[in-house]
C-alpha cells in the first residue's frame, strides 16, 4: 500500500491523534473508559491479505459489537493468498473460504480500490475510527545492490510470481525464457516455487489458476537447467521439506547436488530441531545415496535439471558482449563463521562465474512506509511496535509482515495477527482508545467521494469472482484471473 505521493499533515489538523509522550500520561481523548454499552467500536484494517483478514476475524469473534472496515489498494481481496501462493498449491488457498465468511459478516466491510497514503491518509483514518491496524504486508523486494542488477534479464522473484499469478502491475513483465539456464539467488520457499514453475511440464499446470498468458510463455520456454544459489550451507536453507520433496519428485527433472557440500553434516545434525533434521537428512540422501532402479530410470529420461549451489554470494551481474542483457552471475565463494543462529557467510577471496540467460533475485521481500505520519524502520523494513502497538501512536496497530518482517508461513501470520487483535481489545477494555462515537466509513466515504475515488465492495468482488470462474470453465481451470484493472472496473460498471 505504498503511496504515490507524500503529503505532510500538521498534528493540529487532527485533534485527538497527536502521539502520546508515554502511555502513562494519556491525552484527554484517551483517558475516559470506553463504554461498550453506548458505542460501537469502529476499527479500520489496512490490507486484505492474511494479516488483515485474520486480524479482522479475531476482532469480530471476540467483540460482539465491533465493526471492521478492511481497506485494500487492489480491486480484489486476499493479498498473497491470491497473488503469491503457487498455482499448483490450491490447498493453501482454501483459507480464502474462511476469509470470505469474515467479509460477508454484517459487521465487516471490504473497501477495495483505495490506496491508503494517497487516496486517504492515516491521520484521516485515525480521526474516523477508534483504532487503525496496518496489515499491508511487504510489497517490495530486497535489492541485490550489486553491479549489473539493472540489466534486462534480471528479474525479482516477487515480480515473476506476481506475473504468473495475475497481479495487474506485473503483467508487462514479459520474462524472456529463451535461454537454456536460469539462476535463482536465494534458497527460500519462493525460490523453490519459481524453480518448480519454470521446470514443471506446462500440461501439469493447465488445470490450475495460472494465467493463460503465463502458461503460453512457459509452453515456449527453453529453460532446461535452474540453479538455486545460497550464501550459506545446507544447514541454513530457508525452504521447507514439503517444497524440497516436490522438487525432488518433479516429473521430467533430476536434481544436481555436490556431495562435497555435505561432508561431515551427518554428525552435525544430531542435535538440531526435528524439522531441520528431517530436511537436512532428505538433502543428504538425495546428494549422497545411489538412487534405486526405478528412480535411476526416471532420472535417465529427465530432460531438465535443477541444482543447489551452496557457499556462493552474488558479486556482479555479467553482461553479454554488447551489454544489452544478462549473461551470467559472478559469485564470491564463501565459508561459514560462527555457530547456530549467528552463522554468517564470509568471502574466501575466490570467485566463480555461472552463465545464465535469466537471473531471478529471491533474497527477500520488503515493506514500504505507508504515510509520513507513521514511524518506519527502513533498515528492518517494519513499523516500530511493541506487541503490535505502533510506538508513540495510541490507537494505531500493526500485524503481519509489516509488524515482524517478511518471514513465516500463513499460520505464522495468523498467530501474529491474533496477538495484535488481543492487544487492541485489551486496550479497548482498559479505556486506552478514544471514547465516544466515531463516524467510521461514513466520514471516509465522503472524503473519497470528494477526491473522485470509487471503492469496490465485497459483493463487487463476488461478481468478478463469478466472471473468473465462468471464464475458467471453458478450459477446465478453476478460474481465469482478470488481470486488467480497466476491464474489471468496466465489468462492475465503475
UniProtKB/Swiss-Prot annotation:
Topological type in the membrane: Peripheral membrane protein
Enzyme's top EC category: oxidoreductase
GO biological process: cholesterol metabolic process; steroid biosynthetic process; ubiquinone biosynthetic process
Residues annotated for FAD binding in this entry: 51, 72, 80, 116, 401, 408-410
GO terms for MF: ferredoxin-NADP+ reductase activity; NADPH binding
Signal peptide start-end: none
Positions of NADP(+) binding: 187-190, 231-232, 243, 408
GO CC annotations, alphabetized: mitochondrial inner membrane; mitochondrion
UniProtKB keywords: Cholesterol metabolism, Electron transport, FAD, Flavoprotein, Lipid metabolism, Membrane, Mitochondrion, Mitochondrion inner membrane, NADP, Oxidoreductase, Phosphoprotein, Steroid metabolism, Sterol metabolism, Transit peptide, Transport
Cited Gene3D superfamilies: FAD/NAD(P)-binding domain, NAD(P)-binding Rossmann-like Domain
Predominant cellular place of this UniProt entry's protein: mitochondrion
Modified-residue entries (Phosphoserine), positions: 313
Transit peptide: 1-34
Catalysed reaction equations from the record: 2 reduced [adrenodoxin] + NADP(+) + H(+) = 2 oxidized [adrenodoxin] + NADPH; 2 reduced [2Fe-2S]-[ferredoxin] + NADP(+) + H(+) = 2 oxidized [2Fe-2S]-[ferredoxin] + NADPH
Organism superkingdom: Eukaryota
Location of the protein in the cell: Mitochondrion inner membrane
Entry's transmembrane regions: none
Co-factor requirement: FAD
SUPFAM superfamilies in the record: FAD/NAD(P)-binding domain (SSF51905), Nucleotide-binding domain (SSF51971)
Enzyme nomenclature, EC number: 1.18.1.6
Biological function: Also acts as a ferredoxin--NADP(+) reductase essential for coenzyme Q biosynthesis: together with FDX2, transfers the electrons required for the hydroxylation reaction performed by COQ6.
Similarity comment: Belongs to the ferredoxin--NADP reductase type 1 family.
Subunit structure: Monomer. Interacts directly with FDX1.
Protein name as annotated: NADPH:adrenodoxin oxidoreductase, mitochondrial
Classification of source organism: Eukaryota, Metazoa, Chordata, Craniata, Vertebrata
